[in-house]
Protein backbone atom coordinates (compact mmCIF):
# COMPACT_ATOMS: atom_id res chain seq x y z
CA UNK A 1 0.00 0.00 0.00
CA UNK A 2 1.35 3.44 -0.88
CA UNK A 3 2.05 6.11 1.74
CA UNK A 4 -0.64 8.22 0.05
CA UNK A 5 -3.28 5.51 0.59
CA UNK A 6 -2.09 4.94 4.15
CA UNK A 7 -2.43 8.68 4.78
CA UNK A 8 -6.04 8.68 3.60
CA UNK A 9 -6.88 5.64 5.73
CA UNK A 10 -5.22 7.12 8.82
CA UNK A 11 -7.16 10.38 8.41
CA UNK A 12 -10.39 8.36 8.20
CA UNK A 13 -9.48 6.38 11.33
CA UNK A 14 -8.59 9.64 13.08
CA UNK A 15 -11.98 11.16 12.18
CA UNK A 16 -13.77 8.07 13.46
CA UNK A 17 -11.84 8.46 16.72
CA UNK A 18 -12.89 12.12 16.94
CA UNK A 19 -16.51 11.15 16.44
CA UNK A 20 -16.22 8.48 19.12
CA UNK A 21 -14.62 11.01 21.48
CA UNK A 22 -17.72 13.18 21.07
CA UNK A 23 -19.99 10.14 21.36
CA UNK A 24 -18.34 9.08 24.63
CA UNK A 25 -19.01 12.56 25.99
CA UNK A 26 -22.71 12.24 25.14
CA UNK A 27 -23.18 8.60 26.21
CA UNK A 28 -24.39 9.51 29.73
CA UNK A 29 -27.50 11.05 28.12
CA UNK A 30 -28.65 7.56 27.17
CA UNK A 31 -28.55 6.60 30.84
CA UNK A 32 -30.50 9.60 32.09
CA UNK A 33 -27.43 11.54 33.26
CA UNK A 34 -26.69 15.17 32.52
CA UNK A 35 -23.71 16.18 30.41
CA UNK A 36 -24.31 19.90 30.85
CA UNK A 37 -21.07 21.85 31.01
CA UNK A 38 -22.59 25.32 30.86
CA UNK A 39 -25.93 26.98 31.34
CA UNK A 40 -26.40 28.20 27.77
CA UNK A 41 -29.90 29.47 27.07
CA UNK A 42 -29.88 29.32 23.26
CA UNK A 43 -27.97 28.04 20.26
CA UNK A 44 -26.50 31.54 19.90
CA UNK A 45 -24.79 31.04 23.27
CA UNK A 46 -22.90 28.00 22.00
CA UNK A 47 -22.39 29.13 18.39
CA UNK A 48 -18.66 29.82 18.93
CA UNK A 49 -18.15 26.27 20.21
CA UNK A 50 -20.05 24.86 17.25
CA UNK A 51 -17.88 26.86 14.83
CA UNK A 52 -14.72 25.68 16.60
CA UNK A 53 -15.85 22.06 16.32
CA UNK A 54 -16.65 22.55 12.64
CA UNK A 55 -13.25 24.19 12.19
CA UNK A 56 -11.57 21.16 13.73
CA UNK A 57 -13.53 18.47 11.84
CA UNK A 58 -13.61 19.98 8.34
CA UNK A 59 -9.86 20.42 7.60
CA UNK A 60 -9.14 16.66 7.86
CA UNK A 61 -12.07 16.02 5.51
CA UNK A 62 -10.58 18.51 3.06
CA UNK A 63 -7.17 16.85 3.54
CA UNK A 64 -8.65 13.46 2.64
CA UNK A 65 -10.17 14.86 -0.54
CA UNK A 66 -7.04 16.82 -1.46
CA UNK A 67 -4.79 13.83 -0.79
CA UNK A 68 -7.01 11.70 -3.01
CA UNK A 69 -6.62 14.08 -5.96
CA UNK A 70 -3.27 15.81 -5.42
CA UNK A 71 0.20 14.36 -5.50
CA UNK A 72 2.35 17.49 -5.87
CA UNK A 73 5.46 17.97 -3.77
CA UNK A 74 4.22 21.35 -2.51
CA UNK A 75 0.97 19.78 -1.28
CA UNK A 76 2.90 16.97 0.43
CA UNK A 77 5.01 19.55 2.30
CA UNK A 78 1.89 21.44 3.36
CA UNK A 79 0.17 18.19 4.36
CA UNK A 80 3.09 17.07 6.52
CA UNK A 81 3.00 20.40 8.38
CA UNK A 82 -0.76 20.05 8.72
CA UNK A 83 -0.41 16.62 10.34
CA UNK A 84 2.14 18.07 12.78
CA UNK A 85 -0.34 20.84 13.69
CA UNK A 86 -3.05 18.28 14.44
CA UNK A 87 -0.66 16.22 16.55
CA UNK A 88 0.21 19.32 18.60
CA UNK A 89 -3.50 20.14 19.00
CA UNK A 90 -4.26 16.55 20.07
CA UNK A 91 -1.44 16.61 22.61
CA UNK A 92 -2.74 19.92 24.00
CA UNK A 93 -6.26 18.46 24.21
CA UNK A 94 -4.95 15.39 26.03
CA UNK A 95 -3.16 17.60 28.56
CA UNK A 96 -6.31 19.73 28.96
CA UNK A 97 -8.40 16.60 29.58
CA UNK A 98 -5.94 15.58 32.30
CA UNK A 99 -6.61 18.89 34.06
CA UNK A 100 -10.40 18.40 34.22
CA UNK A 101 -11.71 17.06 37.51
CA UNK A 102 -12.73 14.34 37.78
CA UNK A 103 -10.41 12.85 35.18
CA UNK A 104 -12.45 10.75 32.77
CA UNK A 105 -9.99 7.95 32.13
CA UNK A 106 -11.80 6.34 29.20
CA UNK A 107 -11.59 9.68 27.38
CA UNK A 108 -7.89 9.91 28.27
CA UNK A 109 -7.32 6.42 26.85
CA UNK A 110 -9.11 7.39 23.63
CA UNK A 111 -7.19 10.68 23.38
CA UNK A 112 -3.91 8.80 23.86
CA UNK A 113 -4.93 6.44 21.07
CA UNK A 114 -5.79 9.42 18.84
CA UNK A 115 -2.39 10.91 19.64
CA UNK A 116 -0.73 7.63 18.61
CA UNK A 117 -2.73 7.63 15.36
CA UNK A 118 -1.62 11.22 14.82
CA UNK A 119 2.03 10.28 15.33
CA UNK A 120 1.62 7.42 12.87
CA UNK A 121 -0.01 9.86 10.45
CA UNK A 122 3.02 12.17 10.87
CA UNK A 123 5.38 9.31 10.06
CA UNK A 124 3.42 8.10 7.02
CA UNK A 125 2.98 11.67 5.79
CA UNK A 126 6.75 12.14 6.09
CA UNK A 127 7.28 8.95 4.06
CA UNK A 128 4.90 10.30 1.42
CA UNK A 129 6.77 13.62 1.42
CA UNK A 130 10.08 11.83 0.77
CA UNK A 131 8.66 9.45 -1.87
What are these regions (language model features)?
Residues 1-18:
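Cytosolic juxtamembrane helix and N-cap/initiation of the first transmembrane helix
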Residues 7, 11, 40-55, 76-83, ...:
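Juxtamembrane helix-loop boundaries in multi-pass membrane proteins
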Residues 14-57:
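Hydrophobic transmembrane helix segments
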Residues 55-72:
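Canonical alpha-helical transmembrane segments
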Residues 58, 76-95, 114-117:
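Hydrophobic alpha-helical membrane segments
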Residues 67-77, 130-131:
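Membrane-helix interface "capping/anchor" motifs
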Residues 88-108, 129-130:
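Membrane-helix boundary connector in multi-pass membrane proteins
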Residues 115-131:
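Membrane-water interface at the C-terminal end of transmembrane alpha helices
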Amino acid sequence: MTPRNKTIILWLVFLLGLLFHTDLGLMPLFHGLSVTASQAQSMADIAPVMWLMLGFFVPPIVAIIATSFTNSQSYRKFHFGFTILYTVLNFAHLIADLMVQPIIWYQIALMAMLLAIGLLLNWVSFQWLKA
